[in-house]
């Protein structure tokens, strides 16, 4: 359930505007409301879960064509292990690999020996050309959403894309 705490329209010096919303999201489904008309999603996240990436592409209410993710932690081996412990692990791995080969899924990692990137930022390009920028506390991971008492606070800016 999304609980909107604040809404406003912001006008910039050039006259363009963006709708601003600050919200508390307690569930993955409420967070997915930001991605309803998404065509392309660019994401910087501290942690991610292969199963959640798979869910984004499989969700019947979304039309995500591509996802590009920069992962800022150093838990790559843990992701492999967590995927092995997932129902349908082979199916998920095969689907993600197919998406990667088709160019629809790109996952970048940082050199974690030098830096950890703790940012959570999503740029959503919608099918109508509008864009949504989300900045907040929500990781693209199972831990961020399932069985957690954590509330993710996000700020979203929506523009017409120009």
Where in the sequence are the language-model features?
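PLD/PLD-like phosphodiesterase catalytic module centered on the HKD motif
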Residues: 1-162
